[in-house]
Amino acid sequence: MLMKCLPAAILITGLSYIFLIPEEPLIIKILFKVLPMLLILLYARTNVGRRGRYQSLILLGLFFCMLGDGLLIWFVFGLSAFLIGHLFYISAFFGQWNFSWLRFATILPISIYSTWISREIVHSLIEKGEHNLIIPVICYVTVISLMGWAALMTGNAAAIIGGLLFMISDSILSWNKFIDDVAFSGPLIMLTYYAAQFCIANSIRRKPSFHVSKGLKSERLIQ
């Protein structure tokens, strides 16, 4: 029963934070930002599927990302928490390595993209005189790019979608924060972020949480 209710609760609390909660008071804003992540963490904990090391690493990743949500008002501390969370995700995904030349080759476009966006951000930071952020930002872009590629290498649809959505979310956030304003950046960042974390939590399942009927084959996640 709990597993059936949690996705709806995650959706409701996530949309409430994005569209209803005001910027002030800040403590209320932070609490509502963390609440969907707490529910996603609970969802991952009660998920029946890859028990053991994979689930433990995903849970640790979710926890540090939730911590990052609360600390992001102190940017470097929040960024550090997210970086640690991604390291746990990377470890979990590489533990589910499922080699394919096609998936392996995605390292090239991901590397090109991460190099390009890193250069754009660094150029902007230099112009603004924020040299102290250059190394942390480069480290973070490198780690999240590796996380996205590691997710692709699992062959797990939920992990892949989650990893790519996370990259999209952080790309919008980085561009908006360091380079130029992005229209509707707030909703876009958080919608893709919560969706990414939910998909990563759902990757614990051994079977997909949905199926396609009426002439279409049910999707099977590659283990």
Model-inferred region functions:
Residues 1-223:
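Polytopic alpha-helical membrane-helix bundles and their juxtamembrane interface segments
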